[in-house]
Each structure stands twice: as structure tokens, then as C-alpha cells.
Swiss-Prot record:
Cell compartments where the protein resides: Secreted
Cystine residue pairs: C62-C125, C112-C144, C207-C241
Any one Gene Ontology cellular component term annotated for this protein: extracellular region
Residues bearing attached sugar chains per UniProt: N147
Residue sites binding Ca(2+) 1 per the record: D85, N86, Q169, D170
Organism: Limulus polyphemus
Leader sequence residues: 1-24
Record's protein name: C-reactive protein 1.1
SUPFAM superfamilies tied to this protein: Concanavalin A-like lectins/glucanases (SSF49899)
Key word Cytoplasm present: no
């Protein structure tokens, strides 16, 4: 398999080449993955989405991930606005538990039946609905203990913010912390403006061939949405579950 190294940009570079995730794909490849090397100031490997999110009152956020360590907190997805740096945040702590923060409300922390193994691909889906504040996390197709209601009831995730993968934003696009970063890989990240049902989430967690995939994010679609890469992020072809 030929590895494609995606464009990277140092922190001093003001304009970065657009990173198209589809550019890593070759005929016969299943998908593309993004590798995040270790962070150490002033280098904070990350992907930054081009554009912003719309107002959202329901979401499903799913992705495949592989971690190289379980030390500190591993921040996967960060959406920050001028008013709230934790408008939407997903992470894993040192115990391998999953945390989910919506609209700056108290974090949902859950224990999942499938433990996280270093160097192994896992699939996770986060859902939230404003109507009753129901928030859930499912790992490898199984819902976790501790899913809750009453999370950010009646709230709206606001448009105009910035999506960053692999780092935690303590201000829009900045104030990163090397102990709050992802050291590992991400693939097949999709975001919907609705709550997917259990059957759909179970389906997404399976190792399906591209011809069998029919569920793609309508807000973020892994093979369509444009990102900018910074500080040594590497893009390459990937076969999920290989």
C-alpha cells in the first residue's frame, strides 16, 4: 500500500493548503486516516475545518479512532465559539472513560462495555437532542452506562465557531495544551443534524466495504469536508479494522 503524506503547515504559516481527505484515496482503498503525532509547545498537530457549523439542536457525531497512549486527556473533537470554548467537545480520560460536553453544560462521563485498547481501532458515536437534553455515547456499537437526560435542555449549538480535531480549544483557534491533545489516528468522522437510531449507529460501527456505506454526515462528511492541517499531521490511505 502506497502511503500518501498530506500537506502540513507550521504554526508560523498563516495560510495553509487545503487538505482534501479524498486526495489520499487510491483505487481499491477503503478510506483515509489522519495521524496526529505527539504535541509539545509550540507544536500542536491538528486539523481545522474550513467554514463553520450551522445552528444545531440535534446532533450525531461519529468517528473511528486509534490512540497511542492513555495518559492525560485525549481530545478528539472541539467546537468553540466566541461565547463558549466548549460548545461541543469530546474526549477520553486516563481511565479510558468517555466525556462529552455540550454547550458548556456539565460534562457527561460514561463507562463503556468495550474498553479502549492502545493501538486498536474503535468506533464511537455521540448523540444529543435539545428537546429533552438526552445525550448518549456508544462505543463499537454498544451504548455506554451513564447516558443521561437534562443536558443543555432547550439550548442551541451556535453557528460561527471553529471546529478543531486533535486539540482542545480554550479560545477560538488557540490556547492549546499538550496534555489535552490526541496522540493517535482519526478516520471516517461524520456529523449529522439529527439523532441516528441504534440500528444506524450499530451499522456504522461495522467494517463495511465502501460500496456498502450509505450513511454519511450531512453537516461534516469525511470525504467531502475541507480541513487545514497544522504541525505535522499526516494523511494516508487506511483500511478500517485492518
Amino acid at each position: 500500500m502506497k502511503t500518501f503524506h498530506g500537506p502540513t503547515c507550521g504554526t508560523a504559516v498563516s495560510l495553509c493548503l487545503l487538505l482534501f481527505l479524498t486526495s489520499a484515496l487510491e483505487e481499491g482503498e477503503i478510506t483515509s486516516k489522519v495521524k496526529f503525532p505527539p504535541s509539545s509547545s509550540p507544536s500542536f498537530p491538528r486539523l481545522v475545518m474550513v467554514g463553520t457549523l450551522p445552528d444545531l439542536q440535534e446532533i450525531t457525531l461519529c468517528y473511528w479512532f486509534k490512540v497511542n497512549r492513555l495518559k492525560g486527556t485525549l481530545h478528539m473533537f472541539s467546537y468553540a465559539t466566541a461565547k463558549k470554548d466548549n460548545e461541543l467537545l469530546t474526549l477520553i480520560d486516563e481511565q479510558g472513560d468517555f466525556l462529552f460536553n455540550v454547550h458548556g453544560a456539565p460534562q457527561l462521563k460514561v463507562q463503556c462495555p468495550n474498553k479502549i485498547h492502545i493501538g486498536k481501532w474503535h468506533h464511537v458515536c455521540h448523540t444529543w437532542s435539545s428537546w429533552e437534553g438526552e445525550a448518549t455515547i456508544a462505543v463499537d456499537g454498544f451504548h455506554c452506562k451513564g447516558n443521561a437526560t437534562g443536558i443543555a435542555v432547550g439550548r442551541t449549538l451556535s453557528q460561527g465557531g471553529l471546529v478543531v480535531l486533535g486539540q482542545d480549544q480554550d479560545s477560538v483557534g488557540g490556547k492549546f495544551d499538550a496534555t489535552q491533545s490526541l496522540e493517535g489516528e482519526l478516520s471516517e468522522l461524520n456529523l449529522w443534524n439529527t439523532v441516528l437510531n441504534h440500528e444506524q449507529i450499530k451499522y456504522l460501527s461495522k467494517c463495511a466495504h465502501p460500496s456498502e456505506r450509505h450513511i454519511y454526515g450531512n453537516i461534516i462528511q469525511w470525504d467531502k469536508t475541507q480541513f487545514k492541517a497544522y504541525d505535522g499531521v499526516v494523511l494516508s490511505p487506511n483500511e478500517i479494522c485492518a
